[in-house]
């Protein structure tokens, strides 16, 4: 898959360099010579990162560099001395303390192990614990990327339309594969779209993903508010792959306009912002909603649809046409990913022979029963052994 040749490396490299905090390929300033201590007979190495133990198998030799820290834990870049590949290793501390978070971790591991696509981030390793009975922290090594779309949008670096178009194409190309696996991502946003200096884009964070045929959807927080479609804002439980398409439309306009399209402070304002742009839906467009949702919309002020072309005069009219078809109120009338890829705006990139699908639908069967903490530990432990069979008898 070839991307835009013009200025690609320079623009992305400069954009990455301009960001705060440092992108994942850069060490955090001031962190040098992190001490390493061999443990468990030399089979593991312990590092002290921000006062936390970071313990990985001995193939991840020094130096190791912290590249991110969040509520989930710490991420470090490390070199796998066996494959000579740099990876981003995420430590999820006390991963089994919260059952919902543990299930998210298990779901992401199983999904990413199932998928194999250029535009979906790959898991390179799941590091087994030194002792099975003391298994509390989960370490997952992903392929290392340079930055994410959120950082690029927030940087002051200009991007050509060619770059934006190529990013959109890759998101849709990856999403076609995801949807063909019978999976909805459900949390697409700029932070979950990773980039490298070649403009390669990879979708990440599948912790909220779900099977498309599932009916009991509303058990967890789904889709960051700004990228949430009307059917979710109105509590429709019967949603489809169209939710991801809406999110992509919002992301693309944010990329073109360098600010969020619908930055709502809460559910109520979020719905108002999107209706101020796309207009109050007709009765026909509300057919899919329940009576309570219809009643709520009818009592709101009447909003007239704005002209996207007039509101965004700097955006290519062909791009506007595509976005308008992705941001339709009625999910049944929203473009599918395949339709979006075939849109005239993407003609220069679209190649159906190079847009693979997943041949085997993903099964969420492991979630059909209420898993205990110990069962989730065992399932993740087995995934680690699949990468590291030599640690079977530790």
UniProtKB/Swiss-Prot annotation:
SUPFAM superfamilies: Protein kinase-like (PK-like). A motif (TXY) lies at residues 219-221. Residues 1-10 have a biased composition (Polar residues). This is Mitogen-activated protein kinase 2. The TXY motif contains the threonine and tyrosine residues whose phosphorylation activates the MAP kinases. One of its GO terms (molecular function) is MAP kinase activity. Keywords: ATP-binding, Kinase, Nucleotide-binding, Phosphoprotein, Serine/threonine-protein kinase, Stress response, Transferase. Its EC number is 2.7.11.24. Residues 1-27 are annotated as: Disordered. Pfam families: Pkinase. The modification Phosphothreonine is found at residues 219, 224. GO terms for biological process: response to cold; response to UV-C; response to wounding. Activated by cold, wounding and UV-C in a cultivar-dependent manner; phosphorylated at Tyr-221 in cv. Subicho but not in cv. Pungchon. Expressed constitutively in roots, stems, flowers and fruits of the hot pepper (cv. Subicho). It catalyses: L-seryl-[protein] + ATP = O-phospho-L-seryl-[protein] + ADP + H(+); L-threonyl-[protein] + ATP = O-phospho-L-threonyl-[protein] + ADP + H(+). Belongs to the protein kinase superfamily. CMGC Ser/Thr protein kinase family. MAP kinase subfamily.
């Amino acid at each position: 898959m070839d991307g835009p040749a013009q200025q690609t490396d320079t623009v992305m490299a400069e954009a990455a360099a301009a960001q705060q905090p440092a992108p994942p390929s850069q060490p955090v300033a001031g962190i040098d010579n992190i001490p390493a201590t061999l443990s468990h007979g030399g089979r593991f190495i312990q590092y002290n990162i921000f006062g936390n133990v970071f313990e990985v198998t001995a193939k991840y030799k020094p130096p190791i560099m912290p590249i991110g820290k969040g509520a989930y834990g710490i991420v470090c870049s490390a070199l796998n001395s066996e494959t000579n590949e740099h990876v981003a290793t995420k430590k999820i501390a006390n991963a089994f303390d919260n059952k919902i978070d543990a299930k998210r971790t298990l779901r992401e591991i199983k999904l990413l192990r199932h998928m194999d696509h250029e535009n979906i981030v790959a898991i390179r390793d799941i590091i087994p614990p030194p002792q099975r009975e003391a298994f509390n922290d989960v370490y997952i090594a992903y392929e290392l990327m340079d930055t994410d779309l959120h950082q690029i949008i927030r940087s002051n670096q200009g991007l050509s339309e060619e770059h934006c178009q190529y990013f959109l194409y890759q998101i849709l190309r990856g999403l076609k594969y995801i949807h063909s696996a019978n999976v909805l991502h459900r949390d697409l946003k700029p932070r979950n779209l990773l980039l490298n200096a070649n403009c390669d884009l990879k979708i990440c964070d599948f912790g909220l993903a779900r099977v498309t045929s599932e009916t009991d959807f509303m058990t967890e927080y789904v889709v960051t508010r700004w990228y949430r479609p009307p059917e979710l804002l109105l509590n429709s439980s019967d949603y489809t792959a169209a939710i991801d398409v809406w999110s992509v439309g919002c992301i693309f306009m944010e990329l073109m306009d360098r600010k969020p399209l619908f930055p709502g402070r809460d559910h109520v304002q979020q719905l108002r912002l999107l209706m101020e742009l796309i207009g109050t839906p007709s009765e026909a467009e509300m057919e899919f909603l329940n009576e309570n949702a219809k009643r709520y919309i009818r009592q709101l002020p009447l909003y007239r649809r704005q002209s996207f072309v007039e509101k965004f005069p700097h955006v290519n009219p062909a791009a506007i046409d595509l976005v308008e078809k992705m941001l339709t109120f009625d999910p049944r009338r929203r473009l599918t990913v395949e339709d979006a890829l075939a849109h005239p705006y993407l003609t220069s990139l679209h190649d159906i022979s190079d847009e693979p699908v997943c041949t085997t639908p993903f099964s969420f069967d492991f979630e059909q029963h209420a898993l205990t903490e110990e069962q989730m530990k065992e399932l993740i432990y087995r995934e680690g052994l699949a990468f590291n069979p030599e640690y079977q008898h530790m």
